[in-house]
Every structure is written in structure tokens, then in C-alpha cells.
Amino acid sequence: MASHSSTLFTSPSSFILFSSHRLKSSPNYFTYHFPRSVKRPHFDLRCSVSIEKEVPETERPFTFLRVSDGDQTQSSSYSVRARFEKMIRTAQDKVCEAIEAVEEGPKFKEDVWSRPGGGGGISRILQDGNVWEKAGVNVSVIYGVMPPEAYRAAKAATSEQKPGPIPFFAAGTSSVLHPQNPFAPTLHFNYRYFETDAPKDVPGAPRQWWFGGGTDFTPAYIFEEDVKHFHSV
Amino acid sequence: MASHSSTLLSSPTFAPFSSHRLHYSPNPSTLRFSRPIRNKPNLALRCSVSIEKEVPETERPFTFLRDSDDVTPSSSSSSVRARFETMIRAAQDSVCDAIEAIEGGPKFKEDVWSRPGGGGGISRVLQDGNVFEKAGVNVSVVYGVMPPEAYRAAKGSASDQKPGPVPFFAAGVSSVLHPKNPFAPTLHFNYRYFETDAPKDVPGAPRQWWFGGGTDFTPAYIFEEDVKHFHSIQKQACDKFDPSFYPRFKKWCDDYFYIKHRDERRGLGGIFFDDLNDYDQEMLLSFATECANSVVPAYIPIVEKRKDMEFTEQHKAWQQLRRGRYVEFNLVYDRGTTFGLKTGGRIESILVSLPLSARWEYDHKPEEGTEEWKLLDACINPKEWI
């Protein structure tokens, strides 16, 4: 099977691009105020990808999936989309809990956002902590439509695809963790899943899907036992 | 006359062409050459520009021009190339002298380089001074040959040129000055001259030439008297030549230093122009000279006034955030930086424009009405200061 070489959505922290709205979380929701709306630059990709504007939320929804993608937690046939979303939400929680445990005090600041047509995400940032200079752990779930050229660019497929906009789904978790101490290394990881729907004028056309991700390690000083440990796991 | 749209070599900085590092020592006999630099990356331009490898020098030559371009200063027929080189060398000296005078001790470190076929330059950097965190002032003189496609790309002209490699000459001064005190502003300026020779197989074909340059101002805090002073000096220089220059180049500057992904400017502007050749060449040479000579009176009085002001950690943090924007613009959008990185220029000279440190704080927004907010607002909505 030919490997996918998606250039769009293949960047290590590309999902942050889709969680662009700023939202300050407040411990007391009643004192919460929405920030003045920020003017956003137009998307300037080589091929334009159509995505709705996001809306801030005060609470985390159980799922960011569209109803039609269903969160049938009890069903043995529940979708890869649903299970992948659950996985990345769990990963975010576990990493943030572990970071906060090391921090002993400072907590992540959380921004939650969604889009009316489905999709959304959670950004969590801890800055100027005791141990971490800056730690970010983001998840996002995206529904959009891309023109055929973007799809060909993303998939590097031959132009055997039918013309017509192609609905897509993308979800991922992305994180960079920068410690304060120069002997403690920076970590980056991201894991993402991408899927296309059948174009509307070609019902029943097969879906395309692929996974992407990785974890990498950036120390300023080498402790061989640490590097071996990291690469061994 | 159609304006030039030279994307190659129209960059604000010529730093990419001064790539060898040389430590300057007050005692020449203790001077040692640095270890040779590992091979540069292959040129990866769509059209390759051919430039020889540079050689370090222990002394500043009187001129970096080729003998055929070097005419004695006293001659009334001295070429534009020679006079432009004289001007940028003088600008480098006067700016460095003024900076060292403010520093009261620390001196610039100098690297001199040349190329066997002609051309070369001088890089001067002062780092971790008393007043300046980092100050760089570079001059370079470059001879090269570009294929016709690069020339058309550089000039943006129709393909009515004859095929055949096009020899070119480029010279410029480029500088970024980052003070320590958050109330003292960052300054950037560059002035450059570009000229093509007749191709060898078409002797007598007309030369093409153009000027480019500008001076712009990036404070972290607004002192309106300082911004007005700075812009007034730019306007005075422009008005000596053409009253349409200041409004035109002020706008060009605001448009050029736009950080698209932030929807804000890097700073509070100044003047910027490129590909200028629709005026008399002598007039433009005088204009560039006037602008370069205006740098010291426009900037130094402001630094002297602000360098010792007391500041808090909060002021320093805000300066660092604005330096982060400076980095974003320079690495993502600045044509000089991106051109240099793509053509295998000297990395240290290219990135000397970056500050020593900067800060990226998640979702930082200054509170409305504060001094920080006023600066951000002026970067989002450029003002007419005078």
C-alpha cells in the first residue's frame, strides 16, 4: 500500500492552527467576560481550506464530534473518529495531570472552543511555572471542506479524483513542554488522524484515512542514560 | 517609467554576502584566523546567483571595488559605485562612533572580508554593552553574475532582455540597534545600490540601476515626542528632494513591516523605498546619502534621553514580547533575511538583526488604556505622527 504523504495537516503542531480563538479561563465562571473580538488574518494556504469561525465555550463538551458521528460509548461498533477523539482527550488529561503533579501548585490555563457545524478543541497552557517555563497541550477536532487541489496536495495522489469539494475530518493532540532547568529536556509530541468523506456528488465513494504523529526529545545537555531511556520507551 | 520590482537583491540587508567571521584584535600581531567554516549549503534558488567565496582580511582596504571601478576620490568623474561605497563606509563609521560614544567603554567587534574577484565588506557587532544589548552595522560590496531569469526576476521586467549571464554590482549598509533599556527604541536602517553591467556578448547595452533603503523605529513604549522627533528627521531628509517622498515612503514602510499573521506592524514605521530609478541618478545618490546621514541625529538623542530611565521587570517583559514580534517579522517576512538564508549567506551576519533574547507568552493581551496597549494599538493602526 502506498504511504500517504499529506503535506497539509502533516505538520507536527498543525492543529494549533485551528484552535486560534483566545479565551481566558476564570476560576469563577460568573466573573467571566469574553475578550474583545480579535481581528483574524485570512487563511493564506496555497489551497484554501474552508473552516468555520470558532466560538468560545465555558465548559468542556463530552465530545466535539457531530451528532452523526455519534458517541455511542456502549456500542462495539463505535467509530474510529469517536475512539480517536476519546484517546486524545485522555492523553491531554494524563499529560496535564502529570505536569501539574511535578509543578506542585501552578495549574494549566484552559481555553475551550467549538464550531457551530461541529468540531472544536481545548488548549491548555502552563506558563512561568516552578518547573516549566512553558507547557502547552492542545487537542482539536476539525470538520471542513477542501477543494480537490488541496486534497491532491494533502494526499499527493494522482489526479484520478473526481472534481468537487471534499469534506474532511481531522483530529489530533499536540504538545510542547519546555522546562526551566537547562538540564531538563524539551519534549514535543503529536498524534493525529485524518479522514475524508465521500464528496456529495459521489455518494458511496470510498473514504480515505491516515494517521500521523511522533514524539521527539530536545535536551540542551546530554545525559546518556536519559536519552537511552527516552528512545527505549 | 515602470518601477522595478526586484525581489532578488532588493532586500533591506546585504548581510548574506559577508559570511566569513573574523575576530578583531586590538593588537594585529596577536590576531589569529578562525577555523575554516564547513561547506556552505548549495544555493537553492530558482535561479542561481554566482558569487565567489570570501576571504578574511586583517585590515580594512581603502575600497572593496575592483580596480576598474576605483577612481580617486578627488576625481570629478568618480563613479556612482565608488561614491556610494564611500558613503556607506562613512555611514558605518559615524554610526559606530556615535554608538561607542554612548557606550562609554565597550567597542564594536569587527570582521573584514573580501573576494578575489572584487567586493567584500565589514561587519561590526557590539553585544552586551552598557547601553546596547546588541548593535550591528554591516557594509558589503558584491560583484556577481546572474542568469537572465534571475535578472528578470530581480527586475520584474518583460523578457525583452538578451539571453546571456548578467553581471551585477550591489552595495549597501545595513544595521539593527537593540538597546537594553525598554524605554529606548530599536532602530533599523539600510541603504543600498544595485547596478547591472552589459552582458559580455552585448557590449554597450545600457546599464540598469536602482536604489533601495529605509530607516524604521521600533519602541516598546511610546514617547510621543520621540516618535515625532524621529519622523520629523525622516521628513526633513525627504523634503529636501521631493515633497511626495515622505508620505509615499512612510506608507511603504508601514506596509512592508506588516506582520500578517498578527495583523500588526513590527514597529512605528519610518521610511522605506525600493527599486527607485525613476529620478535622476545623482539626485537619488544624494537622497540616499542624506537619509544615511540622518540616522544619527534621528536616533542618538532619543537613546541618550532614555538609556538611564528606571524600569521594572514588567517593562522588561513587555520589551521582550515586542522583540518576539521583531523576530517573527524578520524570520517569516523580511526579504533580506529569507533571501540570505536561501542563498547560503553568512548566517551570523544575517541573524545579527535578531535580539539576544525575546519572549512568547501565550495569549498575552495588554489591558486597554495601558502604555503597553497604546503601543500595540499604534502597531495595529499606523498613525501619522507629524
UniProtKB/Swiss-Prot annotation, chain A:
Amino acids binding substrate: S174
Pathway: Porphyrin-containing compound metabolism; protoporphyrin-IX biosynthesis; protoporphyrinogen-IX from coproporphyrinogen-III (O2 route): step 1/1; Porphyrin-containing compound metabolism; chlorophyll biosynthesis
Pfam families: Coprogen_oxidas (PF01218)
Record GO cellular component, one term: cytosol
Biological process per Gene Ontology, one example term: chlorophyll biosynthetic process
Protein localization: Plastid, Chloroplast
Keywords annotated in UniProt: Chlorophyll biosynthesis, Chloroplast, Heme biosynthesis, Oxidoreductase, Plastid, Porphyrin biosynthesis, Transit peptide
TM spans (from-to): none
Positions annotated as active site in the UniProt record: H188 (proton donor)
Top-level EC class as recorded in UniProt: oxidoreductase
Cleaved signal peptide residues: none
Family per record: Belongs to the aerobic coproporphyrinogen-III oxidase family.
Name the record gives this protein: Coproporphyrinogen-III oxidase 2, chloroplastic
Taxonomic classification: Eukaryota, Viridiplantae, Streptophyta, Embryophyta, Tracheophyta
Gene name of the encoded protein: CPX2
UniProtKB/Swiss-Prot annotation, chain B:
InterPro entries: Coprogen_oxidase_aer, Coprogen_oxidase_aer_sf, Coprogen_oxidase_CS
Cell location: Plastid, Chloroplast; Plastid
Domain of life: Eukaryota
Function: Key enzyme in heme biosynthesis. Catalyzes the oxidative decarboxylation of propionic acid side chains of rings A and B of coproporphyrinogen III.
Region spans: Important for dimerization: 125-134, 326-361
Enzyme class, broadest EC rank: oxidoreductase
The family this protein is said to belong to: Belongs to the aerobic coproporphyrinogen-III oxidase family.
Consequence of gene disruption: Spontaneous formation of necrotic leaf lesions.
Protein name from the UniProt record: Coproporphyrinogen-III oxidase 1, chloroplastic
Catalytic reaction annotation: coproporphyrinogen III + O2 + 2 H(+) = protoporphyrinogen IX + 2 CO2 + 2 H2O
Marked site (Important for dimerization) residue numbers: H261
Enzyme Commission no: 1.3.3.3
PANTHER family linked to this entry: COPROPORPHYRINOGEN III OXIDASE, MITOCHONDRIAL (PTHR10755), OXYGEN-DEPENDENT COPROPORPHYRINOGEN-III OXIDASE, MITOCHONDRIAL (PTHR10755:SF0)
Annotated pathway: Porphyrin-containing compound metabolism; protoporphyrin-IX biosynthesis; protoporphyrinogen-IX from coproporphyrinogen-III (O2 route): step 1/1; Porphyrin-containing compound metabolism; chlorophyll biosynthesis
Tissue: Expressed in cotyledons, leaves and roots.
Gene: CPX1
Organism: Arabidopsis thaliana
CC annotations in GO: apoplast; chloroplast; chloroplast stroma; extracellular region
Residue ranges the record marks as coiled coil: none
